[in-house]
Regions:
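Donor-nucleotide binding loops and adjacent catalytic segments primarily
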Residues: 1-49
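General structural feature for long, well-ordered alpha-helical segments within catalytic domains
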Residues: 4-5, 9, 83, 126, ...
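A general structural signal for well-ordered secondary-structure junctions
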Residues: 15, 50, 93, 116-119
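Surface-exposed, flexible loop/turn segments at secondary-structure boundaries
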Residues: 23-25, 58, 77, 101
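Nucleotide-sugar donor-binding patch of glycosyltransferase catalytic domains
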Residues: 35, 65-113
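A donor-sugar binding/catalytic signature common to diverse glycosyltransferases
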Residues: 39-82
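C-terminal amphipathic helix plus adjacent low-complexity
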Residues: 107-148
Length: 148
């Protein structure tokens, strides 16, 4: 990533970018943030779009917040096909080829996700959903006494 011409980031004049690591060239629209000061989850929730490698954490946070994800292929990651397939199926992701990423050819990806906007956030009440499902199973098996 050090070989990338990061100053070209300024070509995206309508966009402000922030990241956790310094980048060469000091583009005016890049802002370095600290994990100590900003939680990763809050950064995703307050972003219009996330540009990242795909993984369980970023996938889950993007779904929970309705934040579109522009991601890079991860053929070395066993779960990549499942996560990428889910992003494609939900319409909330955009796979950016490595060449376009490294050449900062992000126009199409940004325009595509911007035109779709944020999606409806996914419910994050998994514990309550699981408890309700367990109660349904107990009721359906006639063990109502276990619920009182």
């Amino acid at each position: 990533m050090d070989s990338m011409n990061w100053s070209r980031l300024e070509q995206f004049g309508e966009w402000e970018f922030f990241g956790l690591h310094e980048i060469p060239g000091s583009p005016k629209n890049f802002h370095l943030v600290s994990k100590k000061e900003f939680r990763y989850q809050d950064m995703i929730a307050s972003s219009d779009v996330m540009l990242s490698k795909i993984g369980y954490g970023v996938y889950a946070e993007c779904l929970l917040n309705g934040t579109p994800l522009i991601y890079l292929p991860r053929e070395d990651f066993a779960e990549y096909p499942v996560l990428a397939g889910a992003m494609e199926k939900s319409g909330t992701g955009y796979c950016l080829c490595r060449e376009d990423y490294y050449n900062l050819n992000w126009d199409e990806a940004l325009e595509t996700v911007l035109s779709k906007g944020k999606s409806e956030p996914v419910s994050s009440c998994g514990a309550a959903d699981c408890a309700a499902e367990i109660e349904n199973i107990i009721r359906n098996r006639g063990h109502n006494s276990l619920l009182t």
